[in-house]
């Protein structure tokens, strides 16, 4: 191999900051790398001793689709089209922060607010929480950061595992190819695909992108001051703001822009628990594992012009404190993981995406093991 250093698999982006800080630490790095390597050895051994799950053929999986009550689909949006937001109020977004992932980013495990009184990590968590809120006070009062976002809604229809969007103003169609679960299910459980939540006879789908801008001058100052703690703290808070913005914008979509839940009144705790109608799956996450759908989404939203968010050649977003995804409004829409797929679906997906097999394999590598 060309690289022989440590490789750490981070399941949740919110934990990346904490992992990176431990890898950079003179006092923690060696123990962390050794412990992780030992854990990975156990994982490999456990995987080798475990039988592979049974896959259905793609035709069998499609025959076992999720049969949604399409008569319950969301009404057309009250405000269709694309809506840009140049500077969402950070003070409002502060109230929508989910603090549990923030603590996990620092390798402090426990749910907020209980973690603040935890017998083991409570004291450390309280100090970190106080520092975070002190920095939040400055971020908001001194306008360190800017929250930019965009949301859009388009008429569409399901066509198999694809969702075809009709761009009326351009007289063109845009196809969103989604993947279907192929692992054999227990009785009465469907092999789900996001397209199952869309009516073939006509429906609506939405999309969004939000980003937090303005970190660079403060990170540069922290670097000059050799203040690693503040550097990591600001990055972690920017990530929390991005997620809070995604949550708040989705709420605005449900109650006002799309308006299929105008009477919704939920606490932040209820929002965090997703006790509302609709989902916002993101490209690169379990229900929609292909990151390469981001350019299609960004084109629909004109996201770069409307938010300043750009995509790298490997579909990562910049600034890194950013979130994007699709909106599904059907009341039965739910999150799920596509998990492992077969060669037949890979070939079908490559055809639907218009790419060669090698490219499709690269995009979907985690789902082929």
Regions found by a protein language model. Name each.
Residues 7-11, 336-337:
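Alpha-helix capping and helix-loop boundary segments enriched in small/acidic/polar residues
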Residues 189-369:
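C-terminal accessory domains/tails appended to large, multi-domain proteins
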Residues 2-6:
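Short, structured coil segments at secondary-structure junctions
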Residues 11-232, 236, 257, 266:
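Active-site loops and adjacent core secondary-structure elements that bind or stabilize anionic groups
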